[in-house]
Curated annotation (Swiss-Prot):
GO terms for molecular function: DNA-binding transcription repressor activity, RNA polymerase II-specific; RNA polymerase II cis-regulatory region sequence-specific DNA binding; zinc ion binding. Residues 252-283, 477-513 are annotated as: Disordered. Its main location: nucleus. This is Zinc finger CCCH-type with G patch domain-containing protein. Coiled coil: none annotated. Signal peptide: none annotated. It comes from Drosophila simulans (Fruit fly). The lineage of its organism: Eukaryota, Metazoa, Ecdysozoa, Arthropoda, Hexapoda. One of its GO terms (cellular component) is nucleus. Residues 312-358 form the G-patch domain. Transcription repressor. It is found in: Nucleus.
Length: 513
């Protein structure tokens, strides 16, 4: 009796775990047979004579053997069905993972301090079957990290080209990390709009590794960012990186903002309807049309907004345009704010506000009376006029150096009359300069003559030393001829100055007499 009850419990447990309908029908029939057998055994146990007990015992043994054989057959059928289900599941997983080859993802990497997820590229599916942490069959994927931070994560360049001579265990670089398919997460693309001061980032250095640092300043126009690298092993801790060489890291504040934005977006999506969305679109279009129409009747200043950014590296007008500002309209959501920037004003030093108001009233209430911009423009006009006068005055002024360059060093006249006119003009020009200026010019020309004579002596020595080289002799002769012409010009200047000085000395003697 106890054996029948134990067999009945086993059948009931198998019936709870059975998933196939045919198997459940067989188990139900076996359960009914056992229940009937138990009922008959209880009913006939008291009425049967003692001499029939051995025959009854034999029948019970036969029934027990039959029951065991049926249970073993059911277990074999269940195990074969489970194996078929597992093979079908693995085939589906391999098909799914094979289609993912070449896609980007976020894969885990085991560091000495824990597990961290990094962006990676799926490059293949491994043949080995594993059981994940949840006890479910899974396949492994081979991934290459796109932002490696350690040497063991750095992809082998020879392996990518199919020319690596080492296997995965002996190569110092990565041939691809093996991760389970269930641990793969969604790819996190870099969001450069998050770049701001003190933002943690990964920066790419020449060693092909991504090092951690913090942002110092960002230039969104040229897409350049200055980063201070963490650690003391970098010679230049502050460097400029392009946006393509940076990967902004996610902070706790970003996660909170994303969660709040997702919650608000989902609540708004549930509360709004298609009709409300269309109404909002119509209102937005009407608002923009009204803003454009308003800009046509708005006061147009002489300088456009943001014109000063032409001389600076400011990006204020570009940021305003990205935030929805329409050029020509005023500030504010309705476009009725100011159009021109608030100008700076400087009040007179040491004067009270009442005195400043009196000065403004005396100027007929001019609001720009103390404007810095007006003062700067006035100063620019005065400086421009002064520069023009100075230019005219300097252009008309003729000093002794200009005279010598124009008259003495200039091209000579071809006729006798022109030479006489030039000499007369030269004499008149020299007479206009003081004796001190003539003395200074005489000393300068004497120094030039001595320097030119030394150069001629060096060229002459070179001619004597290189008498066998025809090409060099030709070049040296050209130099010698040029030096002679310059020396003749300087000597002519010296004679003119000496003549003028001698004339002045003679006049002084005559006046003293």
């Amino acid at each position: 009796m106890e054996e029948y009850e134990a067999q009945l419990l086993v059948v009931e447990q198998a019936l709870e775990n059975a998933a196939d309908d045919a198997q459940r029908q067989e188990l139900l029939a076996l359960k009914n047979n056992l229940q009937e057998l138990l009922a008959l055994t209880r009913d006939t146990g008291d009425e049967a004579p003692t001499d029939e007990l051995p025959q009854q015992g034999n029948d019970l043994d036969d029934e027990l053997q039959r029951l065991k054989s049926e249970l073993s057959a059911l277990e074999a059928a269940g195990s074969s069905q489970t194996a078929l289900d597992e093979e079908r599941q693995l085939a589906d997983l391999r098909t799914k993972y094979t289609a993912m080859v070449g896609e980007k993802c976020s894969a885990p990497h085991e560091h000495s301090w824990g597990t961290c997820y990094h962006n990676a590229l799926i490059c293949g599916v491994d043949d080995e079957v594993v059981i994940n942490s949840e006890g479910v069959l899974d396949a492994r994927l081979r991934v290459l990290f796109t932002n490696p931070t350690h040497r063991e994560m750095l992809p082998c360049s020879y392996y990518l080209e199919g020319e690596c001579r080492f296997d995965e265990a002996k190569c110092r670089f990565s041939h691809g990390a093996l991760v389970t398919g269930s641990s793969i997460r969604k790819y996190n693309p870099p969001d450069f709009h998050k770049l701001s001061r003190s933002r943690p980032v990964f920066a790419l250095l020449p060693d092909r590794l991504w090092h951690r640092g913090r942002v110092l300043c960002v230039n969104f126009v040229e897409q350049v960012c200055r980063v201070r690298l963490d650690g003391q092993d970098h010679k230049e801790r502050e460097r400029d990186f392009k946006f393509e060489e940076l990967y902004p890291l996610t902070t706790d504040q970003d996660e909170d903002d994303e969660l709040s934005s997702e919650e608000s977006t989902s609540s708004m999506r549930d509360a709004s309807s298609d009709e409300a969305e269309s109404d909002m679109d119509d209102l937005e279009e009407a608002r923009r049309a009204r803003m454009v129409e308003l800009s046509l009747f708005t006061y147009k200043p002489t300088d456009r907004l943001g014109a000063w950014e032409e001389f600076t590296r400011g990006i204020g007008s570009k940021l305003m345009e990205k935030m929805g500002y329409i050029h020509g309209t005023g500030l504010g959501s309705d476009g009725r704010g100011i159009v021109t920037p608030v100008s700076a004003q400087i009040l007179p030093q040491g004067r009270s506000l009442d005195a400043c108001m009196e000065l403004r009233e005396a100027a007929n209430g001019d609001k720009d009376y103390f404007s810095v911009e007006r003062k700067l423009k006035r100063a620019q006009r005065r400086q421009r006029k002064a520069d023009e006068k100075a230019y005219v005055r300097e252009s008309q002024r003729v000093d002794v150096f200009t005279f010598l360059n124009d008259r003495v060093l200039g091209p000579g006249e071809s006729t006798q009359q022109s030479e006489q006119v030039a000499k007369k003009a030269k004499t008149n020009e020299l007479q206009q300069h003081s004796t001190k200026t003539l003395n200074v010019e005489t000393v300068r020309i004497a120094d030039e003559i001595r320097r030119k004579q030394r150069d001629m002596a060096k060229v002459k020595q070179s001619l004597e030393r290189n008498s066998g080289d025809a090409q060099l002799q030709k070049r040296l002769q050209v130099q010698m001829q040029s030096h002679k012409q310059e020396l003749a010009t300087l000597q002519a200047q010296e004679r003119s100055l000496s003549k003028e000085q001698q004339t002045r000395k003679s006049k002084n003697k005559m006046f003293e007499f």
